[in-house]
């Protein structure tokens, strides 16, 4: 999607007028594009009977649109100045709850009603994007879909395929747990203050592949960390550094059809899973 990056959604000028200084240490770059706000909300799908969790609502440009559509909205804001102002702004909306906290400390699973899966949305602070994405993965059983704004370079890493320069641990971890789509990229001018980089909206549809690939989530995640520990090293060297037996590594790689000098960045998630299963059988 391109063009049409206006300033504010309808009625959100009230929210945009919420006072509060920009805090660089919190990674605050407030989204002020009408078209982008609408695209993000629409990417979540039908909100009629759903609970939506917004991470980092800031001054509320997206919050306003969500409050008009979702049956239940929970906004998690770390900024001690903005959180009470948002709470005051939406005080008459019984369907809106503002939580003042770091999202990494919030048990997202506890926010879902019995039998319900959450929709998550947020303009994520760049300095903690990876940590928040991993936090979503930890609560994947309670989340159906997440639409998040991240730095373009991070989006490229998340969506990258094997053999590309962006492919790495974040790529395989994300793709193990979700179907990832890049929806649109925004210029710095879509934000206030403008960041120094472009930003991309990602849609994560939670879809764990651990059963399909025949892997144990915890042990396989540790294996992936070992595989990608040092990008310049071969896969075999990284696994030896992780205390796997050299003979077991060589045998497993041969059985899985993996070349001896290959690097982890060259292998698909499926190939890495096959290698892990073979190593597990030999241990």
Curated annotation (Swiss-Prot):
The EC class name is transferase
One Pfam annotation reads RrnaAD
Q: Where would you find this protein in the cell?
A: Cytoplasm
Is Transport there in the keyword field? no
Q: What is the protein's major site of localization?
A: cytoplasm
Q: What is its EC number?
A: 2.1.1.182
Highest rank taxon of the organism: Bacteria
MF (Gene Ontology): 16S rRNA (adenine(1518)-N(6)/adenine(1519)-N(6))-dimethyltransferase activity; RNA binding
Cell membrane among keywords: no
Q: Which UniProt keywords apply?
A: Cytoplasm, Methyltransferase, RNA-binding, rRNA processing, S-adenosyl-L-methionine, Transferase
- Protein family: Belongs to the class I-like SAM-binding methyltransferase superfamily. rRNA adenine N(6)-methyltransferase family. RsmA subfamily.
Give the function comment from the record.
Specifically dimethylates two adjacent adenosines (A1518 and A1519) in the loop of a conserved hairpin near the 3'-end of 16S rRNA in the 30S particle. May play a critical role in biogenesis of 30S subunits.
Q: Tell me the protein's name.
A: Ribosomal RNA small subunit methyltransferase A
């Amino acid at each position: 999607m391109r063009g049409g990056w206006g300033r504010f959604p309808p009625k959100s000028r009230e929210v945009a007028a919420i006072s509060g200084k920009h805090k660089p240490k919190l990674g605050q770059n407030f989204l002020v594009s009408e078209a982008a706000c609408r695209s993000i909300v629409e990417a979540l799908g039908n909100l009629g009977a759903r609970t939506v969790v917004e991470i980092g609502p800031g001054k509320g440009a997206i919050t306003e649109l969500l409050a008009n559509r979702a049956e239940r909205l929970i906004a998690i804001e770390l900024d001690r100045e903005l959180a009470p102002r948002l709470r005051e702004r939406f005080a008459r909306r019984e369907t809106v709850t503002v939580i003042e906290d770091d999202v990494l400390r919030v048990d997202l699973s506890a926010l879902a009603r019995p039998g319900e899966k959450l929709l998550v949305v947020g303009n994520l602070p760049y300095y903690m994007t990876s940590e928040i994405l991993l936090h979503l993965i930890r609560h994947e059983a309670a989340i159906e879909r997440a639409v998040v704004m991240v730095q373009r370079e991070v989006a490229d890493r998340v969506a990258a395929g094997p053999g590309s320069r962006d492919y790495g641990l974040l790529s395989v971890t994300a793709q193990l747990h979700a179907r990832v789509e890049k929806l649109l990229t925004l210029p710095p001018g879509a934000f206030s203050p403008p960041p120094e980089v472009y930003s991309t909206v990602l849609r994560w549809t939670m879809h764990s592949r651990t059963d399909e690939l025949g892997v144990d989530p915890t042990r396989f995640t540790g294996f992936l960390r070992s595989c990608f520990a040092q990008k310049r090293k071969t896969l075999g060297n990284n696994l030896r550094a992780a205390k796997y037996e050299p003979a077991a590594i060589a045998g497993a790689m041969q059985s899985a059809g993996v070349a001896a000098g290959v690097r982890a960045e060259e292998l698909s998630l499926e190939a890495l899973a096959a290698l892990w299963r073979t190593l597990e059988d030999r241990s």
